[in-house]
């Protein structure tokens, strides 16, 4: 559940064409969505797909936003801590970071192109209790910031900040 996008996105195991057409896909070689130190669960989704929004408006997500991951075993609440734009082959950006419990969403960037990847990196918030959708949406309304997002852009070993408008 991504409240800022008002999006319940089903997540499937493996980034196959079929799974990506139906929702988000847990990337192979990344952590299972169980939480815990030394994990990074990486979920890829299209930035829109044949009429389905999916992560179409990913640029609206802002630092501090909540993302809730529900599995058959647990409900984990994460808070967005970083926004990044990377090259498609930059696997370093999705590696486990020692001691951290991360959830990373990845999608194509810019919209309608696939020359880069837009990452939303969120860290587990063990003190946050799951809320109702209405409570989450109210929090989003209260915290909306229309200012451009400060996004870290990593290209060919260099890092820069770029402003990305929340509305495309």
Task: State where each predicted segment sits.
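Solvent-exposed, non-transmembrane regions of membrane-associated and secreted proteins
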Residues: 1-168
């Amino acid at each position: 559940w991504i409240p800022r996008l008002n999006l319940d996105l089903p997540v499937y195991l493996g980034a196959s064409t079929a799974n990506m057409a139906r929702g988000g896909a847990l990337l192979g070689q990344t952590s299972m969505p169980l939480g815990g130190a030394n994990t990074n669960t990486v979920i890829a989704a299209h930035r829109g797909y044949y009429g389905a929004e999916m992560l179409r408006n990913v640029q609206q997500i802002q630092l501090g936003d909540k993302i809730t991951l529900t599995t058959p075993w647990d409900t984990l609440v994460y808070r967005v801590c970083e926004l990044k734009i990377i090259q498609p082959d930059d696997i370093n950006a999705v590696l486990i970071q020692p001691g951290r419990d991360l959830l990373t969403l990845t999608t194509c960037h810019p919209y309608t192109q696939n020359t880069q990847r837009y990452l939303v990196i969120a860290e587990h918030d063990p003190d946050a209790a799951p809320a109702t959708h209405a409570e989450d949406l109210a929090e989003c309304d209260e915290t909306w910031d229309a200012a451009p997002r400060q996004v870290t852009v990593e290209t060919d070993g260099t890092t820069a900040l770029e402003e990305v408008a929340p509305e495309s």
